[in-house]
Amino acid sequence: LSALGVQLTYKVTDNLLFKLGSYDANPATMSLNQGLKLTTSGEVNGTTLVGELEYKRQYKNGLDGDYRFGVVRSSLDKTKLVNNAGYPAGTTSDMVAIEDTDNAFYLNIEQQLTRNSSGGGLRIFASMIHADQSVSAIGEVLAFGGYIDAPLVSRPHDRIGFAVGRNSVSNELSDAQRFYNTNFSDDEVLVRDHEYPIELNYNYVVTPAIQLMPSIQYIIDPNGDNDAENAMIAGLQLSLNF
């Protein structure tokens, strides 16, 4: 059992939904020792609360939209990224505090822009995740992109997609790294900022049971390192559905 939780959904209007969820936040449930146990175990426990507003809208010609805003609150104890002296945790012998509650929020937008004769069309999306930057090394994730279903009349079940993102290192961690380098110039640590991934993929439906998705990614400033060489990655995903 990976997690225990409960979710309630309240229909405010035909287009507006409010969702509230509570989940057991116990990292021990992901261990190999958990196996097929139907209960959670471990000494570290907490609760993750999620509240979400979802607005759905159906426009003319089947151009629907889906818009979500959510807030996440966790009571699981987490070690802060910066120690009491203002340096990155682990770089000096100074104490590191524990944060017993952290918060995050997210925004997700999807909008159908066009419809074609095959029933597909262009759908765009934008998303943002903003984490608690005192405990999460990745402070913010932004993504923008779109995909076209049925891009060709002869390929009504295929999909082509494109996305651009920005993964940002916690501002608190970056500031602490710069502060450390100011005072320990002979033992500098790498200051990380932003990483920019770009991806193009094509989902090719061989049969209803077999799909192939080749993709290519280009990553600017990998791991937020401005001095790192940009990387290109080619991938191939095989999906079987029987």
PLM feature spans:
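Residue-level signature of outer-membrane beta-barrel architecture
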Residues: Y10-V12, Y55-R57, Q111-L113, I148-A150, ...
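Solvent-exposed loop/turn segments connecting transmembrane beta-strands
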Residues: T29, E99, H130-V141, N223-A228
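Outer-membrane beta-barrel "beta-signal"
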Residues: N230-F242
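Short loop/turn motifs that connect adjacent beta-strands in outer-membrane beta-barrel proteins
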Residues: N15, R57-D66, T114-L122, A150-R159, ...
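Membrane-embedded beta-strands of outer-membrane beta-barrel proteins
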Residues: V6, G51-L53, L107-I109, I124, ...
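Transmembrane beta-barrel strands of outer-membrane/channel proteins
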Residues: F18-D24, Y67-R73, L122-H130, F144, ...
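Aromatic- and glycine-enriched pocket-lining scaffold segments that form the walls
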Residues: L1-E52
